[in-house]
């Protein structure tokens, strides 16, 4: 009993929780394959840059119809490395979406830049490209659209904006690996 709160106000309807994601069920479908891969890595002792990583990178590049793929520890690391490769750093601004995993803004912050959040399109939940130019300042160095739910952001207008203003585009595709723009 909660002191001072009448019991009528403490009633909670019986609600069955909705699981965020069932990793146990997902894991069960590929458990044998994972165990075999882990055993191969332990047997080879090649924990970094070994044959398994090289094979994964080739497979991922082929899956994404890309010339190259580079395996890193996480999507966050991929974004940080991409920002650094684009020479984004302290004092710079990167326009991105607020509707994303916290790592998107966190990666921008990690390199010393400031995330500038632009609203999303209500039908796709992706970056509203019409708001990008109005959010730009002289410190804007890049635009980081986030491809969500396997659906790519509207890239054509972003490419035009980037070319016209000398900006880098760094695509956060962590939630849309294999997604195709107008494909």
Predicted regions and their residues:
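N-terminal "arm"/small-domain region of PLP-dependent enzymes with the aminotransferase-like
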Residues: 1-46, 51
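Short beta-strand segments
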Residues: 20-22, 73, 144-146
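Solvent-exposed, non-membrane alpha-helical residues enriched in polar/charged side chains
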Residues: 35, 39, 57-61, 80, ...
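Phosphate-binding glycine-rich loop
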Residues: 42-93, 106-111, 116-119
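Active-site His/Glu-centered metal-binding helix of metallohydrolases
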Residues: 60, 173-174
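PLP-dependent aminotransferase-like
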Residues: 84-173, 180
């Amino acid at each position: 009993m909660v002191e001072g709160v009448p019991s009528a106000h403490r009633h909670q309807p019986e609600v069955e929780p909705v699981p965020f994601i069932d990793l146990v069920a997902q894991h069960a479908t590929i458990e044998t394959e994972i165990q075999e891969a882990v055993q191969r890595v332990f047997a080879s002792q090649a924990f970094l840059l070994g044959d398994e990583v090289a094979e994964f990178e080739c497979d991922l590049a082929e899956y994404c119809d890309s010339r190259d793929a580079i395996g890193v520890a996480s999507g966050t690391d991929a974004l940080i490395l991409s920002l650094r490769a684009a020479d984004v750093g302290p004092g710079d601004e990167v326009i991105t979406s607020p509707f994303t995993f916290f790592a998107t803004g966190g990666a921008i912050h990690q390199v010393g830049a400031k995330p500038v959040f632009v609203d999303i399109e209500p039908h796709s939940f992706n970056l509203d490209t019409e708001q990008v130019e109005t959010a730009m300042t002289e410190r804007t160095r890049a635009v980081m659209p986030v491809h969500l739910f396997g659906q790519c952001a509207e890239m054509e207008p972003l490419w035009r904006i980037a070319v016209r203003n000398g900006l880098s585009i760094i695509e956060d595709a962590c939630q849309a690996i294999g997604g195709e723009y107008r494909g």
